[in-house]
Curated annotation (Swiss-Prot):
HAMAP family: LpqB_lipoprot
First-listed, main subcellular location of the protein, grouped into a coarse class: membrane
Keyword tRNA processing included in the entry's annotation: no
Originating gene: lpqB
Organism in which the protein naturally occurs: Leifsonia xyli subsp. xyli (strain CTCB07)
Lipidation residue positions, type S-diacylglycerol cysteine: 30
Keyword Transmembrane helix: no
Record-level GO cellular component terms: plasma membrane
Listed name of the protein: Lipoprotein LpqB
Length: 570
């Protein structure tokens, strides 16, 4: 058996890095202007990004190429989806070229550690994945460092080596992936149609196919982990009447099958909004038709419109001394009818709903539901509970740190409801947060080997009571010991971790996407989502409230006992 790491791998890695580093180099060396098809009118760049097609132009097989060069060339060529992966298929035998399904998956690897083994005509390639993208476009970070083997078989065809057996899917190094694939945000609804809920997907970044892929994915439904937590406006069975969505002049034309004719006007309006928001990066508007008949759909009125990525106030809500309310400079402005009740509990953790008439509070005496009208209600007295989460339906979520499966939700009646939660491998729970739209939860969990970060959908029963969490997906947790997690937008979460002594780090991750990391403030203890220029604020253990700046962190206030999670604003 022979092991090699061929020169094509290093050469391709350099090209990919150069593409990310310089758009000029990319356009000069690797991009092509379409040389066939009709001339298309470009839309304003600031509004629609689908008018620029960037493609790698990989090389076809060279005459007399060795088996290793054929395998390397095939993997490299599969980075280009142009013309249904035409160049990649040239490396395959004719039967394999017809059978190979590149859309089954994308393995994103680091591009640095590919190794090639062979035993006769059997070849294997070891790659080190950083992520996988499944057939529906859902991005899954790979947390294991173990390499993955891919097997190929080669034969002679017309005197040249060609691949007769290859795994479905493609392998792309990370820098190339970010150039050739683009993140598209699909939207579904919360069960009551009050919120638009994002669902990130990754598709090849080509105009001709992207709009079709997005519309088809919307009709196919949400990512598996969101099933039951969100709903679609489209009638069951509705699909594209023709297998393409055309875009012209910033208008995406979507023709639906006859099943869509079941929809009444309100449903059609929601369908229109769902498609418009899902296609927002590719088109300015959507023309919806059913079996070729264009639908005249009036816009939803403001009262019926769903909220999308609810913002929070740029002023934090804090407990400071005997005061609780909005912080503006050194002044704390009370929340009418709520602040005195919260302050009286001497809170250590608080979440305030969007209307600012209810709050979940943790104090030395347990967890409380505090309301503008009515007495404060103790909803949890079990020892060792972590900071409670809260949702805009008025449910306080509580769980003991050492019993992650003992999650319960309590509403205004004071009756606790067990929320069935399966956290694989969890031995404890550190931090829990409910998304502002109430459809998802994120949790930092302790495991036998360290920590994990998981997100799951929320299933609700009669009256909106949370009953169960969907099977969670695992996210990358970042370096250090995680101590707090927060939603920073409808699609992103941030984790605060202690990295070394008093030092901290923050990892912000798109759910279904990539992660960025930055240095946190010294003594960081709690992170919350924020409005304005900052995605988040951090409360340090010395009582200072810290905000990120371009060069570090700036103290916003001192003597802060708690900074509240905000679920929106009035």
């Amino acid at each position: 058996m022979t092991r090699r790491s061929g020169p094509a791998v290093a050469r391709y890695r350099v090209v990919a890095a150069a593409l990310v580093a310089s758009l000029v180099v990319l356009l000069a060396a690797c991009a092509s202007i379409p040389d066939s098809g009709p001339v298309r009118q470009g839309g304003p760049i600031a509004q629609v990004s689908d008018q620029l097609d960037l493609d790698f132009n990989p090389s076809p097989p060279e005459k007399g190429a060795s088996p290793q060069r054929i395998v390397q060339g095939f993997i490299d060529a599969a980075s280009s989806p142009k013309n249904n992966f035409q160049i990649a298929r040239e490396y395959l035998t004719r039967p394999m070229g017809a059978a190979w399904n590149p859309d089954e998956s994308v393995t994103v690897d680091d591009g640095r550690n590919r190794t090639y083994d062979h035993d006769g005509n059997q070849w294997s390639v070891d790659v080190s994945p950083v992520a996988n993208v499944d057939s529906t476009g859902v991005y899954h970070p790979v947390l294991s460092k173990a390499p993955v083997g891919l097997s190929y078989e080669l034969v002679r065809q017309d005197g040249e080596w060609r691949i007769s057996v290859a795994p479905n899917g493609v392998v792309v190094d990370d820098p190339t992936f970010r150039s050739v694939y683009s993140q598209q945000t699909l939207y579904f609804y919360s069960p009551g149609f009050g919120y638009l809920v994002p669902d990130a997907r990754w598709f090849p970044a080509r105009v001709a196919a992207a709009a079709t892929r997005v519309a088809s994915a919307v009709l196919a439904g949400p990512a598996k982990w969101l099933n039951g937590a969100v709903v679609s406006a489209f009638p069951q069975g509705a699909q594209l009447a023709v297998p393409s969505v055309t875009t012209n002049g910033g208008v995406a034309r979507v023709d639906l099958s006859s099943e869509a004719a079941q929809a009444d006007q309100a449903q059609l309006q929601r369908m229109q909004v769902q498609l418009e928001q899902s296609l927002a990066s590719l088109a300015r508007s959507v023309e919806l038709s059913i079996e070729g008949n264009v639908q005249q759909i009036p816009p939803l009125n403001d009262a019926a419109a769903a909220l999308q990525d609810p913002p929070v106030d740029s002023h934090p809500i804090v407990s400071r001394g005997d005061s609780f309310g909005l912080l503006n400079g050194s002044t704390v402005t009370a929340l009418s009818g709520l602040s005195d009740r919260v302050a009286a509990l001497q809170p250590t953790a608080v979440t305030v709903n969007a209307a600012r008439d209810q709050a979940a509070v943790l104090s030395a005496a347990g967890a409380f539901l505090v309301r503008r009208s009515g007495e404060s209600l103790r909803v949890e007295a079990r020892p060792g509970i972590i900071a409670p989460a809260f949702d805009n339906d008025g449910w306080v979520w509580t769980v003991p740190a050492d019993s992650p499966a003992a999650l319960q939700a309590t509403g205004a009646t004071g009756e606790p409801h067990l929320v069935k939660a399966d956290w694989p491998g969890a031995t404890g729970i550190v931090s829990l947060a409910v998304s502002r739209d109430g459809t998802r939860v994120v949790a930092v969990l302790r495991t036998a080997s360290g920590y994990s970060l998981a997100v799951a959908g929320v299933l609700r029963g009669s009256g909106g009571v949370p009953t169960e969490l969907t099977a969670p997906i695992e996210l990358a947790v970042g370096e250090g010991e995680p101590v707090s997690v927060a939603w920073t937008s409808g699609l992103a979460v941030a984790v605060l971790s202690v990295t070394n002594g008093d030092a901290t780090g923050i990892s912000e991750q798109t759910i279904g996407g990539t992660m960025t990391t930055t240095t946190g403030p010294a003594l960081g203890g709690v992170i919350v989502g924020a409005g304005g220029l900052s995605h988040y604020l951090v409360l340090a253990t010395d009582g200072t409230l810290q905000a990120p700046t371009g060069t570090g962190w700036q103290t916003q206030a001192d003597k802060v006992g708690a900074v509240a999670v905000q679920l929106g604003q009035p």
